[in-house]
Amino acid sequence: MSQFSTEDEAELQTLLRKLLKSVKDRISGAPSVECAEEILLHLEETDKNFHNYEFVKYLREYVESSLGAVIEVETENFTKGEGHAVGSGQDTLVHAVTKNTRESTQYKQMMQTLKQTMMMVVESLINKFEEDQMKREEMDRKIQHQQSISQYADNCSDSDSSFNQSYAFIKHEQLQVIAEKLDPGRPREVRWEALQSLCHAPPSDVLSCESWTGLRRNLSTALTDPDPELSDKVLQFFAKTFSSSPLNVTKDIYASIGNTKTLEAHFLYHKLSFPSGTTSIDANRPDMARLLKQMRLMNDFQKEVTTFWIRHPEKYMEEIIENTLSLLALHSEQGMSSPGSEKSLEPIHLISLLDIKATWFKKWMHGYYSRTVVLRLLERKYKSLIVNALQQCIYYFDSCDALSEETLEMIHSLEHQQIGPAGRTLYTSKELEFVYFVHSLCVLGRLVMYTNGRKFFPIKVKKRRDPVTLTDLVVILINIMYQHPKPSCGETALADTMSPTNLVMEVLRTLCDRTECAVECLYQIPVIETLLAPLITLLTGKLPKLNSMESALTHTADTLARIATTERGLSLLLYDRNLVSAEGESISAAHLIVQFTQKLLAKELQVENSSSMSGAFIFVCRQMYNTCEGLQVLRPYSLHECIAQAWRTTSSMSERVPTPVPGAPPALASQELQSVVAWEEMLLDNLLNFAATPKGLLLLQQTGAINECVTYMFSRFTKKLQVSRCEKFGYGVMVTQVATTAPGIVALQSSGFVQTIVVELWSALECGREDVRVVHPKSTPMDPIDRSCLKSFLSLVNLLSSPHAVWELLGHRALPNKTEYNLREMATSVLDLMDRLIIINSDAKIHSLFNYEQSHTFGLRLLSVLCCNLDSFLLLESQYKLTDLLLQGQRDNVTEPPSGEGEFIIDGLSVERNHILVRICAVGGPSERKLPPRALQKGNDPYPWPMVSTYPLPKYYIFDVPKILRTKQESEIGAFLTSSKETERDASWMDDCRRQFCKIMATKSNTLTGYVLADLLEMVVLHLSSSSNDCFFPPAEYKVVDNSVKTRSLSSVEQLGVEISLRYGKFLKLLREDSEQDLCLLLKHCQEFLSQQRVKVTSELCGYPGHDWFASTVFLLMHGDVGRSLSLLLRFSRLLPSAFLWPPRLHSSVHLPIEIAQSAIHPIYSCTAHYVEMLLKAEVPLVFSAFRMSGFTPSQICVQWLGQCFWNYLDWPEICQYVTTCVIMGPDYQVYMCVSALRHLQQDILQHTQTQDLQVFLKEEPIQGFRVSNYLEYMEGLERSYRSMVLSDMRSILPRSS
């Protein structure tokens, strides 16, 4: 079958025609001939029925009959020469056979024959196609030309291309004839036939012909022809052309449709007046129908053109924009006439009717490319459009009361409008005014979003003496929201998108979300006054003039909440005292809002107290009290108690909701229960947000609702819900904040939160994802902690950061140490993780892990972070003997040669164990110890650092520190002390001491070490404790009797703390070898003294977890002199700094209010850490933001630094200067010290936030390069700004009666 007979050619022609008919829908939608060809060329890839077409089957049979023998011969030859083709060799066989076949003579002959035959078939088809086309045109002349308006309404602005009519080609000569026939002087029938032919032609051919210019001119003339059929036909052609033409052509078509002079003449010729009174405009009236069609086609193009005009020269876009603005600016003077006078219907009214929400303008303003041109033209030529829009909003505002009864009905009718016979056809004047108002509001709302748009203001309008400013506009919009009527029952959903209230709120929300907009438009006193005016009225016992009280107040609260979300807005609400309260005092907005919220909760206002409205105002308060500065302002109102009381009341109501009984309406009972439960959850949610700050968490704990709040948070956390609509992050920060305290971690444990985190970790670590496809197996992890486990790792670090958390989750809990572990047995608690991943002391535990090395490395990394907190390490070491376990692991990781000593096997586990052993054994700051890195080096010696398998540590890891001696350099401060006799130390002595201290710190800070610092501290404490004005705590009698305390025993945790303290003291050459008994005696005295000042608390949370690091610091400072140390501590206990520098001092102390003493939340957390976060946000905002993004909190790391007196984070001289600075300068310097340290670490913090290991960095790394003396001046600046607030709050820790 190498040659085709005549019958074969006829059959081919028939099959090809069938194929083209089958794919007609595909190629008819192509915008050009080239695209149609591409569709046919790739038909096999896109058409699943390709191989079922008869034409394709025919060609396949032809190829098989022509080349079948050749392929068989080539296949046989190849297999004989190469052997059997299996596996990947199959591809080689196919490739070789195909190549040889295509090079054969038979293949070339077959292709030549096929090409010649197909060319004849296609030519015959084209000839037959042209004959059919001529016959069709002849038939078209005889058909009825009448087309209804509804047909156009359905089709005039669709995106169909010319291929919908037929797939044909038209010659340029034919288009020239059509252009001549469209001449206005020709008879109507001739022009009609020409339009018919034009509509059937491909638009691409029409637009590319030489006669297009004349053709377009004639089409524009036909568009204005009184005969509606001709103009409709032109619009149909334009509608099809828009979607398939380049912009340089479509902008000419757009200009033809929107010809300003033509349309203006049309409006004036037909005397289209604006309806008045009971009259209406009829969309079915011929002249009006034509205008609506024309405007609709323009509007469709306006909304679509933004997707492609950036690809063309700016001049095309500018022509389109100018044509539009020129058209909409028609009749501006008449349009601005007073409402009662006769005025004309304008293009802006029709575009408002067709595009009520000004979608075209929003799209044009979205991109900078077009927005620049729009704003430039509006400013230079068409500012009247903006003036008219503003005037329309003012007119609507002035007539709101008169329209209030009809507004809802209009909204309901316009919400689902459809112009044409199938929909609405009559529109009253009020409806046109309303849609013009909505359109104007949307235009103005979009305009003020942008800087250059806001520059149009202030704007001078009629009937207003002063120009309208941006602030005036926002006030008008808020008042419109207030005056909108309340939707009746059942209409709320229908009237939602079109109601003025929601439109105004949409604008206000947009402004709130953009900082610059909010600053210029919303953060203004008149705006805040307008928002709060109804609240002030209600607080004075009167009713405000609001058409819908609940709706207006709820929207007001929503706006205020969004304002409070930003720093500038929050500051405006908290500190600008420009409002007058009900009592006539000048107060800030925050005070007014919280007073109103309290009265709402107490139901003391003349308003229908719905839960949604109350919840909205609580949410405004929440946006303030979930920040440190906001809580500072709102705390005096005890809002947490008001919300907690409302929650308790609601909770009891939900318990009393009756069970549905037979015969009772079940829907009502169910709805009531849902409402009560929703209100209860809303109150819990708002209570929970007190936990966003340290002091707020203390307030939450005092309400007694912390367990319920954490359980609620856990339910939202498992659903991956955000904290609120105004929060960008999830619950990470709040969980971390809660986990810092003992009651918080207990609540997290009981809620199931801890178990969820552990299970997620175990699933990621041991289970992993399923390798569904062999071609894409799970990658081998290159990092010790795989990225899939990193989130769980950081969650655990945050959770276990505090020693309280470790104590509550692991204290007095023995490891299971099972003899056998089921492979399917998952870890569900922190104790399980300790047992399965960290303390792996048996083969059973090793065999129970699928990824032993990776999982154990993960466990050791977690252990390393936990051990950074000295108190956590002491607990773990005392219970689980970590050091012995790690040393044994190192000894087991040694080769066993036939003779001599073995060598350490360097692997990930041995390197990690080595790092931990050095970390837990060597104590010191950045210049006092050296920690081995975890990474290996390139070269012959990948790990040159000594491996630790026995104690003591190799000297490589410990720097040599010179012994501190009394020197002449200390004479300056020493001279000051010796010159100050006890009788001369009057009230001014302390001021002199501070000045001398600051002077020496600034010039010779290196001399403030050793004995002179001990002398200075001792004399300062003696002076302050001798003054009744400086004593903060009442005197406590304590008789120092060594024999009575020697019978006391130290716990294993305390004993280990003694060992570490002695090791550090000996390393610093401050202690003798026999100092252990003295330090133990000092600690026992401290315990005895403090135990006499503790309340008896039934809670299990009140045991102090850890060692007394401050007492050990004083012992080292006094060079091991137990007498001087105890004497200083006893005197120091009467001073305010002792409450914050000496953590055990106020643990469960009788000096604290009983509810705080029982909370187990120390003032170091609720006061010091709280103000660290507050000052950090104001002074070092980048660092504060970094903490927020990481899910870690500044309070956590500060509590760890302060709890262990900066041991392992600062060198010994800096620790001594920290203590002395806080005693001499004041306890508030503890806050400034932490802020300074975090400011010093700013670059590192920002870097590690990006690498997602901020918490690990802060806990594991010392504070490199930090010197107290370098930051003392900065701290003095903080003192001048914040002392009055910080120090007064520190003093307020005692009950007021004290």
Swiss-Prot record:
Required for high-level Shh responses in the developing neural tube. Together with cdk20, controls the structure of the primary cilium by coordinating assembly of the ciliary membrane and axoneme, allowing gli2 to be properly activated in response to SHH signaling. Disruption phenotype: Fish are viable during embryogenesis and early larval stages, but exhibit curvature of the body axis and hydrocephalus, and curled cilia in distal kidney tubules. The keyword Secreted does not apply. One of its GO terms (cellular component) is cilium. This is Protein broad-minded. InterPro entries: BROMI_C, BROMI_M, BROMI_N, PHAF1/BROMI, Rab-GAP_TBC_sf. Keywords: Cell projection, Cilium, Cytoplasm, Developmental protein. Pfam families: BROMI, BROMI_C, BROMI_N. Its main location: cytoplasm. Interacts with cdk20, which promotes cdk20 stability and function. Residues 1171-1283 form the Rab-GAP TBC domain. It is found in: Cytoplasm; Cell projection, Cilium. The gene is tbc1d32. GO terms for biological process: axoneme assembly; cilium assembly; non-motile cilium assembly.
